[in-house]
Amino acid sequence: DTQAVYESIRNGDVTISHEVWQSTFGKSFYTAMAKGGIIDAGTHTAKTLEEVGVPQWVVDKNLCPGLPDYKALIKCASVFATPDSGGKGRILEGPQSWHGEEYPDRVEALLGDDWVVKFAGSADAIWADHASAKKEGRATLTFNWTPNFTDADGFVFIEWPPFYPGCRKQDGGDSKCGSPIGWLKKA
């Protein structure tokens, strides 16, 4: 719980948080700073991205020609079908509490009815899916983020239309956009 970490810093129980992600923790970070007792200790050189994509080997094996362009997914839905997707291409998102309807809205807007978003119970479920897909030689399309340990094995993020403020349905847009690139700070 990030907010608990910020409160612990403010109370002197924790000295530093080395990982404040703009997209998921930015608002609570600035709220904590406004209360006092916590500072912006600088920005890492690494940029952050929280997005769906494929393990590098899916691209290397050309399982869906044209990746990472999202338009390739329109023609490859069957390649990403799983037993629980009803014959549709499946995107394995993190737990629904992470992003709500953000990815289902985007999939509906850009990929249509041939795709379905399934929610994993945890990050570990996503990594287990990567491992089983690699062992079985099947394509998988999952949520991921960078920087992350998966960077070492290679992970290719889908290239959606660029993010702009207001593009998501919950912000009044049509959800025909990808995720923003963000900063990574220390508190």
PLM region descriptions:
Residues 1-17:
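Extracytoplasmic small-molecule ligand-binding "clamshell" domains
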Residues 3-4, 22-42, 109-111, 118-187:
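Flexible, solvent-exposed loop/hinge segments that line or gate ligand/substrate-binding clefts
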Residues 5, 66-69, 73, 99-103, ...:
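Stable alpha-helical elements in mature extracytoplasmic
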Residues 10-14, 75-78, 100, 108-112, ...:
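Sec-exported extracytoplasmic/periplasmic mature domains
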Residues 13-15, 86-89, 111-115, 137-140:
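Loop/turn elements at helix/coil->beta-strand transitions in domains of secreted/extracellular proteins
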Residues 15-19, 50-53, 90-94, 141-144:
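Structural recognition of the beta-strand scaffold that forms the well-ordered cores
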Residues 37-92:
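A conserved helix-loop-strand patch within extracytoplasmic ligand-binding domains
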Residues 59, 65-68, 83, 108-109, ...:
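A residue-level marker of the well-folded mature domains of exported/periplasmic proteins
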